[in-house]
Design a protein with these regions (language model features):
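Nucleotide-activated sugar donor-binding and catalytic core shared by glycosyltransferases
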Residues: 1-249
């Protein structure tokens, strides 16, 4: 009863998606006071830094790039083991960008112990002969996305709940994610519905999908284009919220 009264003391509730709007109504908010205004994250319009992107391109030297972004402890081991099983069939550079900087050295050791050759972004050396490039830099994620042919969003093979898929979507990148994406449930569902993303259940299926995409350039391009189209279609939340606020004032 208390939350019912509190919600209805508000002039209006602007939610970021329909699921949230429905929950407010279930909690007792009057239907005419709840509006789905959209998610302001879509209005950020993320872009990569040109100089940083150029520097990373100099390292990758035009190779096919598969980026595993914002990975967590336990995920890299799964990814490396599954990669080793199909390594001879994939002519691509694997890029790891761990979520937490304190794990850079740990991920390097994992790769080396698996017999993989590795270069670090910080060395600025060419990765033409390397199996793995370690993204041991801060604030450069958009540039890693920019040079990627395929992006896997980490935090989704463990119980973290996934990470922001909108950034690679804004850059027209094909996006793959694991089974656990509860932090981005609606966005991941929309990406799947729009044929703008692929969900896998484990790292073995992840590399099955990667090989399928690399052997099917049309599907690869279509996934990226659909991701960008979805991102663009969701923009405008800031303007909608501003108009709502002005109407109330």
């Amino acid at each position: 009863k208390l939350i019912h009264q509190t919600l209805n003391n508000l002039s209006l509730i602007a939610s970021q998606n329909q699921n949230s709007a429905d929950r407010f109504i279930q909690l007792g908010a009057q239907e005419d006071k709840v509006v789905n205004a959209g998610n302001i994250k879509f209005d950020q319009n993320p872009k990569s830094d040109l100089l940083t992107t150029k520097a990373i391109k100099k390292i990758t030297q035009g190779r096919v790039v598969i980026t595993f972004a914002s990975t967590h402890s336990g995920e890299e081991v799964q990814i490396i083991n599954s990669y080793l099983a199909v390594k001879e069939q994939i002519n691509a550079l694997v890029v790891f960008v761990p979520r937490h900087p304190e794990r850079f050295n740990q991920v390097e050791k994992l790769a080396l112990s698996a017999g993989l050759s590795i270069e670090r972004r910080s060395s600025a050396r060419s990765a033409t002969q390397a199996d793995v490039l370690l993204g041991d830099s801060m604030g450069e994620m958009m540039s890693y996305f920019e040079v990627s042919d395929i992006v896997f969003m980490g935090g989704s093979l463990n119980d973290t709940g996934g990470h922001n898929m909108l950034e690679p979507a804004a850059l027209s990148k094909p996006i793959i994610f694991g089974p656990n994406v509860f932090n981005f449930a609606e966005i991941s569902s929309n990406l799947l519905n729009k044929k703008a993303g692929i969900q896998v259940q484990d790292s073995k299926q992840l590399f099955t999908e990667i090989m399928q995409l690399l052997n099917n350039p049309e599907q690869l391009e279509s996934l990226g284009a659909n991701a960008k189209q979805y991102f663009d279609s969701q923009q405008g939340a800031v303007k909608r919220i501003a108009k709502i606020a002005m109407d109330i004032i």
